[in-house]
Amino acid sequence: MSTDAEDVSNDRRKYEFRKVIEELREYEGSGTQLVTIYIPPDRQVSDVVAHITQEHSEASNIKSKQTRTNVQDALTSIKDRLRYYDTYPPDNGIVLFSGAVSTGGGQTTMVTRSLESPPEPVQSFRYHCDSDFLTDPLEDMLADKGLFGLIVLDRREANVGWLKGKRVEPVKSASSLVPGKQRKGGQSAQRFARLRLEAIDNFYQEVAGMANDLFVPKRHEIDGVLVGGPSPTKDEFLDGDYLHHELGDVVVGKFDVSYTDESGLHDLVDSAQDVLADQEVMKDKAEMEEFFEKLHGGEEATYGFEPTRKNLMMGAVDRLLLSEDLRSDVVVYECPDGHEEYEVIDRRHDDPEHTCSDCGSASEKTEREDVIEYLMSIAEQRGTETKFISTDFEKGEQLHNAFGGIAGILRYATGI
């Protein structure tokens, strides 16, 4: 189980990765000359160096002199970076980006970035050379991660597993002993029908047992259970209360799926996309609902940079709420009399001139930092949890547009 400190560290690392990814997505090459390499943690660095050497040799066949030179320079730069690593890359692997990016007016500049230990392990080695950097696998790692239990069943077979983020993990399966329907009448048919119902009931109990064994130990972490199969079967299963009552309470959707083998788990996830999207937003909605309740019902809420900063410094903030769309820097100023003040500006803008509100003197900039990293640093020191809030719903938009993308739920009222 991760500690609060680990969670904060992970949030910070994810945000730092997200910033780099946004930067990389803006870059364009004038041709297929931007190189991306994904290296899993179990891939020997020497193997990667050999692969790069081979690619460098093959790049000599590129007809365009400029593209040929740029690709080979990018490969050389990546090869130089790999000299700093031992036999294997760091935990979770490493992703390297290098290439000549366009700066306008026909000019280019060489950019090289290395991202060590991404949020999840790199799954496989990938070499990519194109007009843009390959960031999709990293973006998938940074996507909201839910944990959902999956059940697909008909009267012949069943499979249960997990949906972890975007990854489906089949875990258990079962085949039934339910016989086909009897066509003839008479007492033997009635007896057969009774035995068949008993076999169906036994199979449903077996499936529920698999699901209960897998999901109940994770009941405090699970975001929901999805059930799929033909209409009569899944409805009978759910209506029969076979699942543990704590699982029955978190069934968030049932869906018609044609297959009930392992591929049926993937079909179930595809069918549940709308429900899964709603579940991701629901957590953010709950945070914002609590924020507005605190805001309207008393003084245990704060918003805006300066009030939130002051409350953070006091250790009064339980949860720091930051908009996912916040893209600003904080500039710290100090006047000749030692008064310190802060100004939040668009990160694309230059430092504005600042006059001290206390003494009216011109102030000098002493620091400029990403506002999210600045606030998260204080939050980490004060044991405050940080939550990133989506703008895909009304109150999430309000946080960004009306409250400057910064708010907090307080542990106690401070009057600030």
Curated annotation (Swiss-Prot):
- Kindly state which keywords UniProt assigns to this record, in alphabetical order: Cytoplasm, Protein biosynthesis
The lineage is: Archaea, Methanobacteriati, Methanobacteriota, Stenosarchaea group, Halobacteria
Q: What is this protein called?
A: Peptide chain release factor subunit 1
User: A Pfam family this protein belongs to?
Assistant: eRF1_3
InterPro entries cross-referenced by the UniProt entry: eFR1_2_sf, eRF1_1_Pelota, eRF1_1_sf, eRF1_2, eRF1_3, Peptide_chain-rel_aRF1, Peptide_chain-rel_eRF1/aRF1, Ribosomal_eL30-like_sf
Tell me which SMART domains the record gives: eRF1_1
Recorded source organism is Haloquadratum walsbyi (strain DSM 16790 / HBSQ001)
Which GO-annotated molecular functions does the record name? translation release factor activity, codon specific
- This protein's record includes keyword Cytoplasm: yes
Q: Which HAMAP family match?
A: Rel_fact_arch_1
Kindly state the subunit structure of this protein.
Heterodimer of two subunits, one of which binds GTP.
For this chain, the family text in UniProt reads: Belongs to the eukaryotic release factor 1 family.
